[in-house]
């Protein structure tokens, strides 16, 4: 079912103690609130088992930032989808541009990650988006369509369980932001691609988040677009006042 969502991506930030403190602070900030969106925090693996029981599950969902493309076994340093799920986490970010760029994650690797996440009851937040050169060459639709191949071999039933997140890679951590019109244009293209593959009903029920330097000052304008269903938030998720300011954009 299509929902408004604000999901925080902590990336490689916060020690265990700092992460616990941040989660507690967010939980307290929302204690007397009824957000008009689903709120999710995606944390480094070390935080999951500590943070999940700390927050009010009715208001804050918890997820990981990645999982392995293998079920289990001799893969030193990897963390499986089953391990993530065993902490009580419900979500996992997959296909983030930083993992595609720095760790060589391909369409095939991501297919396996998505399937394992779903098999273990996790909701994938699947990221797609173009770099600056691709945007300047007007190839953003072509790039995004190719990235969607990682999830377009799912059954309609499984696809309906995922959340999509569009990242204009050129806007991540740069302070640049796609204009509301640019965001709406690419989100509408993504929804039309989903409709072409799975039909209008599933497309209309798919949440598509915006993930590029979203902050309290621009969130309301971005979220006002008909095909923008919330945000995948990086830097602003590390400060409760900023993160709550984005959540409040739906109020």
Swiss-Prot record:
The keyword Isomerase applies. GO terms for biological process: gluconeogenesis; glyceraldehyde-3-phosphate biosynthetic process; glycerol catabolic process; glycolytic process. Keywords: Cytoplasm, Gluconeogenesis, Glycolysis, Isomerase. Its EC number is 5.3.1.1. Substrate binds at residues 9-11, 173, 213, 234-235. InterPro entries: Aldolase_TIM, TIM_sf, TrioseP_Isoase_bac/euk, Triosephosphate_isomerase, Triosephosphate_isomerase_AS. Pathway: Carbohydrate biosynthesis; gluconeogenesis; Carbohydrate degradation; glycolysis; D-glyceraldehyde 3-phosphate from glycerone phosphate: step 1/1. Coiled coil: none annotated. It comes from the Bacteria. It holds the Pfam family TIM. GO terms for molecular function: triose-phosphate isomerase activity. It is found in: Cytoplasm. It catalyses: D-glyceraldehyde 3-phosphate = dihydroxyacetone phosphate. SUPFAM superfamilies: Triosephosphate isomerase (TIM). NCBIfam families: tim. Involved in the gluconeogenesis. Catalyzes stereospecifically the conversion of dihydroxyacetone phosphate (DHAP) to D-glyceraldehyde-3-phosphate (G3P). HAMAP family: TIM_B (MF_00147_B). PANTHER family: TRIOSEPHOSPHATE ISOMERASE. Belongs to the triosephosphate isomerase family. This is Triosephosphate isomerase. It comes from Bacteroides fragilis (strain ATCC 25285 / DSM 2151 / CCUG 4856 / JCM 11019 / LMG 10263 / NCTC 9343 / Onslow / VPI 2553 / EN-2). The gene is tpiA.
């Amino acid at each position: 079912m299509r929902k408004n969502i604000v999901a925080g991506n902590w990336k490689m930030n916060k020690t265990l103690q700092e992460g616990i403190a941040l989660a507690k602070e967010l939980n307290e900030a929302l204690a007397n609130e009824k957000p008009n969106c689903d709120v999710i925090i995606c944390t480094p693996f070390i935080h999951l088992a500590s943070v999940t029981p700390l927050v009010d599950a009715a208001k804050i969902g918890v997820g990981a930032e990645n999982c392995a493309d293998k079920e289990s076994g001799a893969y030193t340093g990897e963390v499986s989808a089953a391990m993530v799920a065993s902490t009580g986490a419900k979500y996992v970010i997959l296909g983030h541009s930083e993992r595609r760029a720095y760790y060589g994650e391909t369409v095939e690797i991501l297919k396996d990650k998505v399937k394992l996440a779903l098999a273990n009851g996790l909701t994938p937040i699947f990221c797609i988006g173009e770099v600056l050169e691709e945007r300047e060459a007007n190839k953003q639709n072509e790039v995004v369509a190719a990235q969607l191949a990682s999830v377009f071999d799912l059954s309609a039933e499984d696809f309906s369980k995922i959340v999509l997140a569009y990242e204009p890679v050129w806007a991540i951590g740069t302070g640049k932001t796609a204009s509301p019109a640019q965001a709406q244009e690419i989100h509408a293209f993504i929804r039309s691609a989903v409709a072409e593959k799975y039909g209008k009903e599933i497309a209309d029920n798919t949440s598509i988040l915006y993930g590029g330097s979203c902050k309290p000052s621009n969130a309301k304008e971005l979220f006002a677009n008909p095909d923008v269903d919330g945000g995948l938030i990086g830097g602003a998720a590390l400060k409760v006042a900023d993160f709550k300011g984005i959540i409040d954009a739906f109020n």
